[in-house]
Each structure stands twice: as C-alpha cells, then as structure tokens.
A protein has these predicted regions:
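Post-DEXD/H (motif II) to motif III coupling segment of the RecA-like Helicase ATP-binding lobe
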Residues: 425-434, 441-507
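Conserved Walker A/P-loop ATP-binding site and its immediately adjacent core
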Residues: 313-337, 347-358, 472-477, 549
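Walker A/P-loop
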Residues: 280-303, 443-444, 469
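A substrate-engagement module of RecA-like helicase motors
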Residues: 332-404, 410-414
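C-terminal helicase lobe and adjacent C-terminal extensions/tails of nucleic-acid helicase motors
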Residues: 477, 528-636, 657, 661-927
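Conserved pre-motif I regulatory segment
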Residues: 251-288
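Accessory nucleic-acid engagement/destabilization modules that flank
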Residues: 2-251
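Conserved interdomain linker/interface between the two RecA-like ATPase lobes of SF2 helicase motors
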Residues: 487-556
Length: 927
C-alpha cells in the first residue's frame, strides 16, 4: 500500500467520522498562522527575528512547527489506543509489537520529541536547532519529557518497521507543501535562543487547544482535498473571531485628559515627558511615590503610551492580593472602555475567586450573547459587539493570561517562571505586553526572587514593565533594576519617576509634592485597651489594621456586644446613598444576600466591621464591598464606625479613615497602612482635622512574640529596627521623611542598637541574614532565573516539572512550589452534616454535592464557600485526603477539601477545633 494512503489511516481524534492526524496537523498550523495574523506587527517581528527571517518567511515556518506538535501520534502506542482506529491502521500495513505496546505505554508528546528531532534533521536542520525545537514541541501537553519516558519511547522506536518513519516523513512533507514551505529547511541562524523556543512551544500548545475543538473544526473533512489548507485557514480565522482572540489596532496617542476626568498632577505629567522619545526596545518605568498620589492613573497612561509607540498586545496589572485586584478591577475596566473607542476588548480578572466579583461576573454575562463558543447560549442580534467584555474561553485558568487585558494577582504571572504545567503559556501571554507590577515593596525575599526571574523573562520576551511602589529600600530597588539589566545609575531624590531601556537610563524626574504631616502616637497592644482607645476617638470613620486574624477577631469582640448587622439593615439605615463607588453594587445584590451578616451595631449606634482572609470567599467578597462602600471615596460616610482588618486592607484598597490604629509593622508597610489616613479631601469630624496614626507597641518594651505572634508574621530584626527608628518621633513629614526612615531601618546594623538591645539585635540579625540567603537561594534555584533553564532537566527548577505539578490541583507536593513561602495551607469548603447529607449552611438549605456530575451552579456554589487555612495540623491532615470524586472532575474544585464545621484535629496536647462564626469567620479553639 502507498505511504500516502497509509498516512491517511492514522487518526488524531476518535469518533465516527474520525479526524485524521494529517487533518489535525493542518488545522493546528492554520490556527497558529491565524493567531499571528491577528497579533500586533511587533509580535510577528519577534517571531521573525528569532529565526533571522522576514515576516513572510517566518509565518509558514512557525505554523509548520506548530503543526508538527502531534507527530508523536504517528506511533504504534497511540494508534493502538482506539480499537476501531487501530484495526484500520493495522489493515493498512502499519503493524506493531502488541506485547510491547500493551505493557509499555508512553505519552504521545514524548514520541513527538523523538520524531520531530528526526524529521527536522533529515530535512536539513542541524541538531543544535532540531533538538531544542523537538523538546519544546514535545512539551505541548504541559511538561518536558523525562529521562525514563524517553528511554522507554526509544525502545518502541527501535521495534518499529521502517514504514512508520516513511509515513511520518510524508506527513511532514505534506504539511510543509500545504503551507508553501520549501524543503530542505535552511535557517540563517546559529542557535535557537530560549525565548524563540518558548514562543514556538506555547503557540503550538494553545493552537492545539483551539484546533481540537470540533465546534470550530468539524470532523469528516478530507485532508487530501486541494482546498483543505485554505478551508482550514478560514475556519481558524472564524474560530478566533468567535472566541474572540484579541485584535487591537493602533489608535494613536491620546491626551491624559481624554482618558481621565481630571488634569494630570506633577507625577502623572512626568510620564509622557520621560516616554516622549521611546526607542524600539522594551521599557522599564519605575514609579516611586507616596500613597494616594495617582500612581495607578500614571501607570495606566504610561501603558497607553507604550502600547501605541511600541505596538504591545495588551496590559496585565499584577497586584499582591485578591482584594487589591478586586479594588482596581473596575477602574481598569473604565479606563479600557474609554480607550477602546467601541472596539471589542477582552478583560479578565485573574485570581482564585474571580467569579465572585460582581463586576467581573457582569463582564462574563455581557460577553455571552456574542459568543458561539458556549453552544447552550444563543446569539442576541441586538447585542452590541464592542466595548470591554470577558469571554468564556479566556476565563479558564490556564487561558486567562492569553487575553488582551487582565487584572489579577502577581502569583498568576509568577507561575510562568516556575515549571508548573503549561507555565510557558503564561509567559507567552505576558509576551509583548505592558505589565504593571504594583506594590513591589510588599513581597518577601522568596517572592521577590521569583519577581526578578519574571523581569528577566519579560524583557527577553519583548514586554515593557511598570514598577510601582510607595516605599522601596535601596537594595531591593537595585536588585529589581539589575534583573532588567540596569546597574550603576544615579536617581533623583524621592518621590521620583525613572525610565530605562536597553540596559540604560532614558531619563528620571524628581516629583515635587505638597508636604503632609502625619502625627504619630504610641498605643497599647492589649486588645481591650486598643478597643477603648478607639472608642474614645469616636465619632468618625476609624480603622484598625492588626497583624493576625486571631487578633482581629479578638479586637472585634473587645469593642463590645452588639446586634448582628445584616446587609438589609445596613442598606435601610443609609437609604439609596450616592450613585458612585461600591454602594450601588450592594443594592444590586440585596435580594440574594440581604440576610447575610456584615458586622454589628453597638448600643450607642457605632457600626463595627471585620475584614480578614479567614471568611469563606463569598462572605469575604461581600465584606470587602461593604468596606469599600462605607470607608471609600464615594460612600455614605457613617458618623460612627470602626473597621477592624488585617493586611488585606493594607494595599491598593481605596479606603479613607479619619483616624487609624496599626500594630507595629516594618516601616514601609506601616506607612503603606498610613496611606489610608485622610486619603481624600473631605470635611472631617471634630478632633480629626489632622491625620493621626496610633501605633500599638511603640511605647512598650519591644516584645513582638508571645501572645502577639508578630515575629511570626514579620522579621524580629526589622520590627526592632522600626521600633527604634520611631522612638521619640511625634510626626512624620510625607514624602520628605519616608526615604530616610526606610534607609535607617533597613541599613541599620546590630552595632547601631543601644546596649540593652544589642545582643538580641545580633541574634535576630543573623537569623534574618540566614533566612534571606536561604529564601533568595531557593527562589533562584527553583525558578527560571536563567533563560537557558527553559529546557533544562538538570537543575532545581526542573523539580516542579518532575512532580508534574498542575496549579489547578492541591496536594502535598504543590505546597513545595508555591509563589510565596510560608506555612503550608489548604483551601477548604466548610460543610455541615445532617445524617448522610452535606450542606453549605447551618440551616440545611444549600446542599453540597459530593458525588455524581456537577452543574455550573453546583460548582460555583461550592467554590464560593472556599477559604484557605494554614493552622497546624489542618493542611498536613487534609492534603493527605483526596477530594470528593465529583470535585476531582472539576478544574475549579479539585484543589479544595471538604471540612466539617466543628471537626477536631488531634495535636500533641489539646486538639484544634475549627468552627465557622457568621460574624468572626473561621475560628480556632483548643479542646
């Protein structure tokens, strides 16, 4: 039988009719081709430069490589996996060793690596190019092939008849001919650089996802038909239109006032000045300025300028927490609406609880009538096709980074430099993009180490970066700039904006600002005394930010007994309120969540609220919205109210307190918290005309352990140095004093402490240095801290790949490779048992499905109750238990574990009982 006929019997997708392997290879190549057609010209130029080709020559070459991704399916092991298909192949004369195939299974991606290397070499490509390309394409299902897999695969290859190689050669030749690619292959490039390989392996992977969807590429089409390639290309273009794949046209530079409803301040005006002569290379923009000065608007305007001048594909704004991402989401959306000019722009909210955000849910609903991807929904002919929306296809965790625009946590980006499943697709999504990294001072040494690896890759992939910070120690600033390839530059005094490109300084500006005086007062640490100190400061909208959840719960209780306050009661007490900010959104969810507890009302009418990370996700989201509505810029300002919060209120949330209490924290974080004081211009209650920060622990002896546990949250040495720096200081001038205080705290050596504290300082300093070195080393070892590690299997970064870690799963292994170090933790769903049934609520009105098939509503109901816990031994116990069978089938739920409310976890002495309180959230008790 002719090789051509034999090749057509090979199947890629089973069914009746089946989908031939050649057809799928052509479909995938067509998708890759169509994606690059839609991408900005700069993306195509990056692909062309990778191989020293013109854009017209690069397009068929890259599409050809994408089409080869499934060449491993032309193997006996794969073809034998479907009985009907196997018989057809066998009858065509392609046979195999049945015993070997049955007993030695190998994934087809492993065969792809071996076959592609062989095919490329025999068609003229040198080994130095064929080998890395084959490795990258073999990883299209998420991971590089491992040594043992390759060893077994080679046994199979040795047992194959020569006809198999001839068939694979025919497939490659037929693919090349369809694309107009001449063989033998001649590439005018010496080596395949890591960014070039990443661009190919990622494109092949997600082109495969799209080409594998029969709704876009129906089965039954004959790949031998003369018009097959052109038809596949048209199907690919239509599929991308339907998703819709981003297509952002250059629109010309707009003035700041056109995009924001106010004129730029000095900080914001400095951005276009620095970026006026942007070169063709990527840009790093560093914005260092105090809180509340419009850094976000400055960054967004900079992203607009960079996109227009450098032809970037989109924007990703990375923040420290889900709360900060939620807080910025609507502002980013409004900015993009003004910028899009009626064009359809994609915006995804990227973090674990995104579906609970009402603004994001609204964007998903807005997109659905436009989509054909979800066949359960019909197009609405009257629906507008322009504006900002969030498509179903891009809302999946691994695909979200491919969207044109995103707001999310830094973790979502950092996973790109850890070898978790499909990490390279995350990096591709950030390629040729403007990436805003906010609050870069907020990360520990380990996370900062991963951040440096991310900066290395972003520059290599042609992205521009905007680093934003209120306060950044000099050493940390130098490390981040060094990761971008910049060193030895002198910068003007703080506050400042600086731009870098090509390893050098483009320009820098000192930003003169009106000085603000912050008054410091020492405060007690005992919660009952803190509660009394706060109540003495009423009336006013007061805040208290403490260092631990247990302490927040204790302070909330110490403020006194009160009636539970539901959302219904809160809304009724203030009425319709302003039509701005988060307040209108609370009215929209009243019918669904009106009976939910959001706080308490004391006998004297004072409203008390609690916000921390140990509430189930939907309750935390509601409390977050209430907090923003009442303590934000536009809310119905309560006359007497106190918010007790943990670090979730520390960053990016637009809160404005008349007075703030804070536990002692590292100086940079302490003044980050102080940025919530008198944030906006408004009439203040009597006694609150000047901003006052009460600091717990400032007047006491510096004891941060024992029942406080502050030294488990922050380094004892940094707390000690902060405590010393603030002794005797009654005011801080912002911004004049901030940089000096920062350097004093972080550059102080043990010899700079008084005699009474020097021994303790020496010990805690050595502990700090040891841990910093260990964490920095771990980040450097585990991440892609060097570009050449992309395909390496011989360094520590390969460990995540060896464990086959999927960021959608949660088990004991995934805990070793988190984007942030700390105690092990696990996401749980608190459940109530009634007989043999489980419920999400104590009243037994919301069933929790554990078996069978789950609908979308079932999944969302379970997911919305998730809460992450880290108290020993909860994670250690639950991560050893498998999720319920129904949950394991769901990408959203497989990382969760059920937790019966009231369950006791044995320990050496007293057991730990876990309860759920409507006012306090998850509560731990020793029993």
């Amino acid at each position: 039988m002719e090789v051509q006929t034999q090749a057509l019997t090979l199947w890629a997708k089973s069914g009746d009719p089946f989908h031939p392997l050649l057809a799928h290879m052509l479909d995938t190549a067509a998708v890759a081709w169509a994606i690059l057609e839609r991408e900005p010209g700069r993306t195509r130029k990056l692909y062309a430069t990778d191989w020293n080709l013109g854009e017209k020559e690069a397009l068929p070459w890259v599409a050809f490589l994408a089409g080869l991704h499934d060449l491993g399916k032309a193997s006996p092991v794969f073809q034998a996996a479907w009985d009907e298909g196997a018989k057809r192949v066998w009858d065509a004369g392609l046979t195999w060793d049945e015993e070997l195939v049955r007993e030695q299974w190998v994934a087809h991606g492993v065969f792809t690596e071996l076959y592609v290397k062989d095919v490329l070499k025999r068609h003229g490509l040198p080994l130095r190019l064929a080998d890395p390309l084959a490795k990258g394409l073999g990883a299209h299902h998420g991971f590089l092939a491992q040594g043992e897999e390759l060893k077994t695969a080679r046994l199979h290859v040795k047992s194959e008849a020569s006809t198999w190689q001839e068939v694979r050669d025919h497939l490659a030749l037929r693919l090349a001919q369809s694309l107009g690619l001449n063989l033998p292959l001649v590439l005018p490039v010496e080596d395949a650089e890591a960014p070039a390989i990443l661009r190919v392996m990622a494109l092949a992977s997600f082109a495969d996802w799209i080409a594998s969807d029969p709704r876009f590429f129906p089965y039954g089409r004959d790949p031998e038909a003369l018009e097959y390639w052109q038809d596949a290309l048209e199907l690919a273009r239509k599929a991308l239109e339907d998703l819709p794949w981003p297509r952002v046209s250059p629109r010309g530079v707009r003035r700041f006032e056109e995009l924001f409803p106010f004129s730029p301040n000095p900080l914001q005006s400095s951005v276009p000045e620095l970026l006026e002569k942007t070169p063709g290379d990527s840009v790093l923009l560093l914005v260092e300025a105090p809180m509340g000065l419009g850094k976000t608007e400055a960054a967004l305007y900079a992203s607009h300028l960079l996109r227009e001048r450098l032809d970037h594909r989109g924007l990703y704004v990375a923040l420290p927490t889900q709360a900060t991402a939620n807080g910025l989401f609507n502002r980013i959306r409004e900015f993009l609406e003004r910028l899009s000019g009626g064009e359809r722009w994609e915006l995804q909210l990227q973090h674990g609880a995104a579906l609970l955000n009402p603004q994001y849910a609204e964007l998903l609903e807005r997109a659905r009538p436009m989509e054909v991807y979800d066949l359960e929904l019909e197009r609405n002919p009257g629906q507008e096709s322009g504006g900002v929306a969030a498509s179903t296809w891009f809302s999946a965790k691994k695909r979200a980074m491919l969207a044109g625009h995103g707001v999310g946590t830094l973790d979502q980006a950092l996973l790109g430099v850890l070898k978790v499943k499909h990490h390279f697709i995350r990096l591709w999504g950030l390629m040729n993009r403007v990436v805003v990294l906010d609050e870069v001072h907020a990360y520990d040494t380990y996370t900062s180490g991963l951040l440096k690896s991310l900066l290395l890759w972003l520059r290599a992939l042609g992205s521009s970066v905007i680093l934003m910070t209120a306060t950044l120690p000099k050493k940390k600033r130098e490390e981040l700039l060094s990761a971008w390839g910049v060193g030895g530059v002198e910068l003007p005094p703080y506050p400042r904006v600086a731009a870098f490109s090509g390893g050098g300084l483009l320009g820098a500006r000192h930003v003169p600002l009106e000085e603000k005086t912050l008054h410091l007062q020492g405060a007690p640490t005992e919660v009952s005394q803190v509660a009394e100190a706060l109540k003495e400061q009423l009336p006013g909208a007061l805040g208290a930010i403490v260092n631990t959840v247990d302490r927040a719960q204790a302070l909330y209780q110490a403020l006194g007994e009160g009636e539970r306050l539901t959302l219904d009661e809160l809304l009724d007490s203030f009425g319709a309120g302003p039509n701005q900010g988060a307040w209108p959104g609370l009215w929209e969810i009243r019918e669904e969540k009106g009976r939910w507890v959001v706080g308490k009302r004391l006998k004297d009418g004072t409203l008390v609220f609690l916000l921390h990370a140990r509430f189930p996700a939907e309750e935390r989201a509601l409390r977050e919205a209430v907090t923003l509505a009442l303590f934000g810029k536009h809310g119905p300002r309560p006359e007497k109210a106190i918010l007790v919060a943990t670090q979730v209120a520390e960053q990016s949330l637009d809160l404005d307190f008349d007075l703030l209490y804070s536990d002692l924290a590292p100086v940079d974080l302490l003044f980050q918290r102080a940025g919530r004081l008198h944030r906006h211009t408004r009439k203040r209650p009597e006694g609150h005309q000047t901003p006052v920060l009460l600091v717990g622990g400032l007047t006491d002896e510096p004891e941060f352990g024992r029942e406080l546990h502050w030294n488990r949250v922050y380094e004892d040495y940094v707390l000690l140095s902060t405590w010393l720096a603030l002794q005797g200081r009654e005011t801080v001038k912002v911004p004049a004093d901030l940089e000096g205080l920062l350097e004093e705290v972080y550059e102080r050596l043990p010899e700079g402490f008084p005699d009474s504290l020097r021994d303790r300082a020496r010990k805690s300093y050595q502990n700090l240095i040891d841990r910093l070195q260990k964490d920095a080393s771990m980040a450097g070892n585990l991440s892609l801290a060097e570009l050449d590690r992309l395909l390496s299997q011989l360094d520590a970064s390969a460990l995540a790949s060896d464990f086959r870690l999927d960021d959608e799963e949660e088990n004991a292994s995934t805990q070793r490779f988190l984007t942030r170090l700390g105690e092990p933790s696990v996401s749980v769903v608190p459940l109530y048992r009634r007989g043999e049934e489980w419920f999400l609520d104590a009243d037994g009105r919301r069933p929790a499905k554990m078996k069978g098939d789950l609908g979308k509503e079932d999944v969302l109901a379970l997911w919305s109750r998730a809460v992450r816990l880290s108290r020993f031994p909860i994670p250690q116990t639950l991560l050893g238990e498998k999720p319920p069978s129904a949950w394991a089938k769901s990408g959203l739920l497989r990382g969760l574990r059920p937790l019966e409310v009231g369950r006791e976890f044995p320990r050496k002495e007293l057991a730990l009982q876990v309860d759920l309180d409507p006012e306090l959230g998850v509560v731990y008790r020793l029993v």
